[in-house]
């Protein structure tokens, strides 16, 4: 176990904060022992992957655990490959591992930063694909009982950018994830930016190259401008809301969902509040993609970025009467903060 306290290089917003202690966990046993110690000493802790979906508002007065449990184990039958993957594997490393071994299926999720465990918590998705579509099971440590248990996909309560692990952040620690990748590959090209590709001749590698180009074209490099990608979720609303908005904004993009509801684009709403490039202190709305808030010169505090997010939120409410929900987790001195405490309007 390695120990340190500085968190700036451990969160992609590059917010300069500290924790009481940072411990790297490489195996299940270490995690279990640390859990027991924390329970006995009445300590609290935060499990972190790459820090690519958190915003630290202030110094964290607890222990940060970096989950680095590794391992990619593959079995197969005639219809699918089955992957048993450590929560501490880098997500993009896993994607490229499967592509190099001719196991296509994860290519639309290429270049999403973070680790496998955090990807499950967030139910990451991009370009028409969500991780939950491939999830078979999740092996977790029950932090209430100290037992290792297996939750199957239907028990994980996956929704758009949600899961049981996000709703019960301090109940489970993810150890391993089980994925199923079907051998009968069907490319997903329905998302804007991919529709021009030829369904009959496209290869997984071509999809990856296209998505890499699209992502680097519109998303900032967190090494230069700290960010977490999309700060807000795309709002899902009833069609009557869209019908009302169409009377005033005939060009508003919207997408019907399987349950009959309609998804709007948060980036479009923010951009149409004329907020692209808006600067507040050391934080700003990225000039190429309004859904991304950035630490402009790597000097912003967490509260500055949160203030910018609140400003954006209020502008969207005032103009469209739509209340955006953050994708990012807000972390205060003693743990996660309910975003409703910040976004009150």
UniProtKB/Swiss-Prot annotation:
Reactions that this protein is recorded to catalyse: UDP-N-acetyl-alpha-D-muramate + NADP(+) = UDP-N-acetyl-3-O-(1-carboxyvinyl)-alpha-D-glucosamine + NADPH + H(+)
Broad class of the protein's primary localization: cytoplasm
Class in the EC hierarchy, top level: oxidoreductase
EC number: 1.3.1.98
Record GO terms (molecular function): FAD binding; UDP-N-acetylmuramate dehydrogenase activity
Domain of life: Bacteria
Pathway in which the depicted protein is active: Cell wall biogenesis; peptidoglycan biosynthesis
Residues at the active site: 161, 230, 327
Record's function text: Cell wall formation.
The protein's name: UDP-N-acetylenolpyruvoylglucosamine reductase
